[in-house]
Amino acid sequence: MRKLLDAHGNQLVPALLAIMTLAVFWQVLGHDFLNYDDDDYITANRYVREGLTPASVAWAFTTFHESNWHPITWLSHMLDYRLFGLHAIGHHFVSLLIHLANVLLLYQILRSMTGSIWRSGFVAALFAVHPLHVESVAWVSERKDVISTLFALLAILAYLHYVACPGLLRYALVVGLFALGLMSKPMVVSLPAVLLLLDYWPLDRLNSVGRFQRFRRLLAEKLPLLVLSTASSVVTCLAQKSGQSLGTLERFPLVARIGNALVSYVAYIWKAVYPAKLAVFYPHPGSSLPLSEIIGAFAFLTCVTWLAVLAASRRPYIAVGWLWYIVTLVPAIGLIQVGWQGMADRYTYVPLVGLFIVAAWGIPDLVCGLVSRWKTKPSEGYVLPFSAALSLGVVACMSIIILAAAAWKQTGYWKDNFTLFGHALRVTRDNAVAHNNLGLAYAAEGKARQAIIEYTKAIEIEPGWADAHNNLGILYLRMRQIEPAEVQFRHVLKIAPQHPAGHNNLGATLLQKGDTNEAIKHFRAAIKADPRYARAYINLGTALDMIGRSDEALRSYLDAVRVDPTMADAHYNLGLSLAQKGKIKDAIKHYEEALRLHPDWPEAMNNLAWLLATQKRPSYLEALKAVRLAKKACEMSNYSDPVFLDTLSVAYAAADRWDEAIKTARKALSICRDPKTAEILKTRLGYYQLHTAVPP
């Protein structure tokens, strides 16, 4: 039986891994995009939505957007958008496929290094379905986790080929794959240290003879990789600083960071063993951690590290697995605080592999010691009696099934914003981020009362969080509650005086109050804080138009189109401004672009139809296009807008369809309530009856 399993294990294990991974995560294909980073990474990112164009590719390699430099991740999202558009199923499917590839690669790497099919399969199975890894797979914005790990694992596989047959080209492949991993997510900066650990075990490149000299040589061998790690770390710090993502020492004192890091190391281990109450966001405890808890964590980590080093000569996998966990978690442990979270499940995607290795090799060795039946074979190591091996296999399978069931349940929480953040609020305390994002979800559904409650709770927990005040202000503004909106936006600017959205939204509020000049000041302040803020340019143009400064307004609309050519509003306003200047051909082009970006926009259809029909000597095809556009605008308004009907009548007249022009003008006149517009319609109707188009 054992021989049969070993003979077919290398075919059976990958198949089982694939089936298990797909069974747990297949449900993500029915999940939505989330309001937690998915908008910035995909749904509202104009460069991603351009697809793989020269401009978007250049942006990917030069931007620090989202406080990161990860061009390969951006390119993967652009390719997804080109293939699937905004259908979330395709984006989730790609992330799932990459995770599956990582599972199979991890198995192949461990089996190649150790020769152990079943232990390697056990590690890969834990990696595949552990609930802590759900976040990296089920969250589209965390594509950077799975894709950076893909390149890191490919680099390790290439390294194994290099070790087997050293050569410059093979080493260059290792360096190249590592560089791609760093350009996907800098979390893999610790790969050179991981390779040194693998040199010790299981590659055994540090034997007892001349160990120090060999270590120096192996360290020198890693220098090109260390240079890349250093460069990536510097770039990452610059990116985080530019995006103001680095936590200040005032908010997160160094002592608090060290304490949280020590406790988090132990907490991740506990969650690996008992993955309960997992959440998308864990609030940072700050300085509230008990000193006894910090000292206890330090003592635990010190003792385990000491024991692992002591066992290194006889059980090298313990030291390698433990140090893998410690070293690969360093970039995300919070000594350099990024964001507000105290911990994050996604940070364990690679580090837990080290603990899985300790379990996969350590538990069988422990059982061997307990049953006192060791059989040493140079090629196979320690061999368990079949009955003990079978029992151990059953326990391992049960453990994997339990973890898979927990992961399946955890994956379900990522279905949409309501389930995700609702669950986070149930399993955490004082979670301002969860309240805020749940508020965003309610606001998107038009449930203003519930959204206000959630925003208010977020502000109660984090009074100094400018974005929460801004979100509440936006909601009040949409509800036409001008005074409460102004209060919130002024709170934003008190907290963060250079907050671009705060200035823009306060400007919009003041514009509704009629304080146009003050609104203009805030729109300009928003642009100064963020020169690529297209919405602020549009609002500035609107305000300038309102006080008759049409030339400046036109320049502002041109700036809006320049910084964001994919914003339909910018093209619409620019078209309106150009038409007022008599630049009809240019105005038509921008209305057409607005409709390309926003196909179901009746006002844009109406304005474009008007220009096509009323320009000097419109062609027959232009007149037909005007009719089609104006008719669709009327259909979308259920033929209840006299302005749209007037445009349709003019379009019919331009196409020499006089009876339809007369009928439509009469319909417009019958529902028109504005005396001036009614007079225009009467005059137009008289001309139509003479089969003559009146000048607009």
Task: Identify the role of each PLM range.
Residues 1-481, 490, 494-501, 505-508:
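Polytopic membrane enzymes that build or remodel cell-surface glycoconjugates and lipids
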